[in-house]
């Protein structure tokens, strides 16, 4: 027997990318504004929407384009010693014989050094009236092999900031700075978000990534429906990815069909803009 319930279609728009997810919520369908209990029921079913990967990808889509930069900050021997010295002075076990404790402490000290460098960069950019926008991760792991490597940082930052990073990192003797523009032909930057998170070793209670406060934070819209019809891309949009939403509850017979209930697409307005740009450049 099917359990009483309803479906929620959650829509996100971040930059040129849209997403829709449809999930089942047990209980009586709201007549108007959902009650607190109904909101809590929705919240329990939406956990997959708040995965670090999806949230990071949305943040990238909403704030950065192909003109912006993927930037790397490495530590020289001198720069690493500076990190270790700060860690020792502040009681972090950077010299511990326990490898996990030592690596966690070094990563924490390096994150502190990055914070100092970012403040320098912001002051430098203030001179030219440019604001720093960025997302950054601190890594001590090879994302492919999983091996521990020298601590370093990966950042996505706005265009025009590379010289400030050179001045505030390399010229301070901390190490090297490298950068490249975000891939112009990659409208969907979910793979870039995956790449960044692959570099981050899991540490209890530690954030996987951080960002500047001035970024646009995408906000979702919810719509309640009664049926489990297949999600469709908005008219004029272009499908990028479709996957099945798995019913872990096993209580709604229709829902056990596990129809594709997550889609990611290029929004119609983005495609119209791209077409106008092509016509203008022709």
Task: Name these PLM-found stretches.
Residues 1-149, 159-282:
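Right-hand nucleic-acid polymerase module
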Residues 152:
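Conserved, short, structured surface segments that act as functional micro-motifs
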């Amino acid at each position: 027997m099917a359990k009483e319930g309803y479906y929620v279609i959650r829509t996100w728009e971040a930059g040129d990318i849209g997403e829709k997810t449809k999930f089942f919520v047990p209980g009586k369908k709201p007549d108007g504004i959902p009650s607190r209990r109904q909101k809590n029921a929705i919240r329990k079913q939406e956990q997959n929407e708040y995965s670090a990967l999806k949230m990071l990808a949305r943040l990238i889509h909403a704030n950065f384009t192909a003109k912006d930069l993927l930037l790397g900050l490495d530590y020289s021997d001198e720069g690493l010693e500076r990190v270790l010295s700060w860690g020792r002075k502040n009681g972090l076990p950077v010299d511990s014989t326990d490898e996990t404790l030592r690596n966690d402490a070094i990563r924490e000290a390096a994150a502190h050094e990055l914070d100092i460098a970012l403040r320098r960069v912001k002051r430098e950019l203030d001179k030219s009236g440019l604001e720093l926008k960025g997302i950054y991760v601190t890594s001590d792991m090879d994302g492919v092999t999983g091996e521990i490597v020298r601590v370093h940082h990966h950042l996505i930052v706005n265009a025009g900031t590379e010289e400030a990073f050179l001045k505030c990192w390399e010229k301070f003797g901390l190490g090297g700075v490298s950068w490249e523009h975000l891939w112009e032909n990659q409208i969907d930057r979910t793979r870039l978000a995956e790449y960044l998170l692959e570099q981050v070793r899991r540490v209890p209670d530690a954030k996987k990534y951080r960002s500047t406060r001035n970024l646009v934070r995408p906000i979702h819209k919810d719509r309640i429906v009664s049926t489990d019809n297949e999600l469709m891309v908005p008219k004029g949009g272009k499908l990028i990815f479709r996957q099945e939403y798995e019913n872990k509850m096993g209580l709604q017979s229709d829902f056990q069909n596990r129809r594709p209930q997550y889609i990611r697409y290029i929004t119609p307005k983005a495609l119209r803009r791209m077409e106008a740009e092509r016509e203008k450049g022709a």
